[in-house]
Amino acid sequence: MNLSTANHHIPLNDGNSIPIIGLGTYSDPRPVPGKTFIAVKTAIDEGYRHIDGAYVYRNEHEVGEAIREKVAEGKVKREEIFYCGKLWSTDHDPEMVRPALERTLQTLKLDYIDLYIIEMPMAFKPGEEFYPKDENGRVIYHKSNLCATWEALEACKDAGLVKSLGVSNFNRRQLEVILNKPGLKYKPVTNQVECHPYFTQTKLLEVSASSMTSFIVAYSPLGTCRNPLWVNVSSPPLLKDELLTSLGKKYNKTQAQIVLRFDIQRGLVVIPKSTTPERIKENFQIFDFSLTKEEMKDIEALNKNVRFVEMLMWSDHPEYPFHDEY
């Protein structure tokens, strides 16, 4: 792949393409007003053309405002921006899928989005609350049919509301439920999962490559925040690894840049999140060097099968994806 800051798109299985690096806009626990707006504008100015967001992040209005401002300035055309939105777990019932996507479009004030993905295979009780809870404070689960949800997404694509469809946090079995669906119209183009040198997801990558189905989009490509609600805080911090530090010195790059370069050389799409302008710029500067085959093998050997984002609070959900090996 001959990728550059000016041209770093890779083809998807439906004829569309995706920029190999994007800006993640997840904010933990809640966004600081105005920060996402500035981050997205900074990213577009730097050369990013892929923005990853979600209605559940509570900042899609700022993402849309930033995109529209940059289009109005003439910095980019709308068709040059790739936006990925997500269907949340309370909207899995087929009749709720299109209204959820339309709500995202209204929030963004855009006519279409480029990719819409099922954020998690686990469904929660439908309603206004993102995390509906019972009297004991436990999230109320909901039985859904992933194939029926997918058919509703296919109808959204046919209606021109979205160009490509994908999934997130799906294991192999759940992905195959969609792929083996009778009458499948559109395959998922991506499966967005946690992936980094401590959790290389080699088997899931092999499944994607062998079936020529979906690209892996790596979230938390640099490790992640250390919020104990979501994250196993006993896991080792990735960016302090000695090998990454030594390679950074060799190439005059940061550990983060080494990791992101490793990921894109593996063919992964990466969506590092940041609201810090300097870091947003730094994360994009990965097209002016490449790692050797030996260095790639050395970084791959760092794998510890450490999953930072375990979502253990939902581990008793029937569709909890991480009981399976991959």
Swiss-Prot record:
The active site is at residue 57. The keyword Transit peptide does not apply. Its EC number is 1.3.1.3. It catalyses: 5beta-cholestan-3-one + NADP(+) = cholest-4-en-3-one + NADPH + H(+); 4,5beta-dihydrocortisone + NADP(+) = cortisone + NADPH + H(+); cortisol + NADPH + H(+) = 5beta-dihydrocortisol + NADP(+); corticosterone + NADPH + H(+) = 5beta-dihydrocorticosterone + NADP(+). InterPro entries: AKR, AKR1D1, Aldo/ket_reductase_CS, NADP_OxRdtase_dom, NADP_OxRdtase_dom_sf. Pfam families: Aldo_ket_red. Subject to inhibition by high substrate concentrations. Inhibited by testosterone concentrations above 10 uM. Inhibited by the primary and secondary bile acids chenodeoxycholic acid and ursodeoxycholic acid. GO terms for biological process: androgen metabolic process; bile acid biosynthetic process; bile acid catabolic process; C21-steroid hormone metabolic process; cholesterol catabolic process; digestion. Substrate binds at residues 26, 57, 88, 119, 131, 230. Catalyzes the stereospecific NADPH-dependent reduction of the C4-C5 double bond of bile acid intermediates and steroid hormones carrying a delta(4)-3-one structure to yield an A/B cis-ring junction. This cis-configuration is crucial for bile acid biosynthesis and plays important roles in steroid metabolism. Capable of reducing a broad range of delta-(4)-3-ketosteroids from C18 (such as, 17beta-hydroxyestr-4-en-3-one) to C27 (such as, 7alpha-hydroxycholest-4-en-3-one). Belongs to the aldo/keto reductase family. This is Aldo-keto reductase family 1 member D1.
